[in-house]
Amino acid sequence: MRLYIKQKIFSLGERFSVKDEFGNDRYFVEGEWLSIPKAFRIYNAQNQEVLSLESKFFSFLPMYQIIRNGEVAAEIVKEFSFFRPKYRIDGSPFSVEGDVFSHDYTILRDGAPVASISKEWFTWGDSYMINNYNGEDEEMLLAILIVIDFVLSRD
């Protein structure tokens, strides 16, 4: 299953849709415009919140908590690195490998590739594709993409 994310370049409220390979809306992502620290909400096609992404305000490096059903499901932490951005996902079997800076990387589950994320260049606004090989937790894959993209855009 493939998911396509198209962020609108002039979207003040940072709301964008996530479509499946057939063009159907699967999710909507909404960034809280004036919140400090920055937060995102992911809604399914029935407009029910499935995940929230909340930044830890007092941390040395960027850290986001992924919250599902009121519980912290995972934390994504940008690790200190001199050359290329590196991310650690705590509390989850997922890890990130590849060229995150170029928005071309692989998501691994317990060391085995389960999805790839790539950015389409030269498009109006940011466009991404998540290629989910085995039907993994697509909400978590989407959350990983959103956090990494947001942190990279702030560096």
Please tell me what each predicted stretch does.
Residues 1-155:
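Intrinsically disordered, low-complexity proline/glycine-rich segments
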